[in-house]
Amino acid sequence: MYCPQCGHQTDGGNFCEKCGSPLPGQSGHQHAAQTGAAAKQAAKQFGSFVLSVLKRPYQECKATGGEQLISAIITMVLFSLLTPLMFYILFSDGPGSVSFTAIFLEPTIYFILFLFGLHACIFFALKIAGNQVSFKDSFSRFGAFLIPFTAILILALFFFLLHTDICFTILAVGLIGAFFAIPPAMLSSYQHSYKGKVDFIYSTIVIYLIICVTFQLIIEHYVKEIFRYMLF
């Protein structure tokens, strides 16, 4: 190994025997350590943010801005994974064959796309109401509002693993609560900058119609898979 500073050949170690400069292996180790420390700090910040939102959901969410973008993305992905995971585990326990793609992967993608679409509808409603909010800020706040409902879905998964029937009631509360409570909560959190061009009530009604159509498509997908699973 040659020192990158003075060119002296060395048999190894952390530093050059001649000039004392750090050898490349040490730099790589430091970079890995820095990456690990950054990941640990990010996880700590996410956990702290989640706890603060769970303690005071609306107050914390309405103060959330673009600085929580990563937390919003993590929450959205986690929310999208939980329901398909429950159904995949449910079908896997039976005697029939289970399609990982149809039961878990595709619904997860549908959930992610739906959440993006739901936020896009809310963002559009805010814009036509005259709010000068950025997409990054509104998306981060949307992810913050998802946190309590993601916690409910985690609770549903916990009871599901304990084989209790109440898990599906909790699941319904988490899903219906998220899809029908977040839009008015989001719109209300920006009411201080409302310019009165379009009333929030009408925006909420349109968003609810889109949600109902999407719910119908998701239910039809799972009903088809259930019949396919039972028949084949």
Swiss-Prot record:
Keywords: Cell membrane, Membrane, Transmembrane, Transmembrane helix. It is found in: Cell membrane. It comes from the Bacteria. GO terms for cellular component: plasma membrane. The chain crosses the membrane at residues 69-91, 104-126, 139-161, 166-188, 200-219. It is a multi-pass membrane protein. The keyword Transmembrane helix applies. The keyword Transcription regulation does not apply. This is Uncharacterized protein YvbI. It comes from Bacillus subtilis (strain 168). The gene is yvbI.
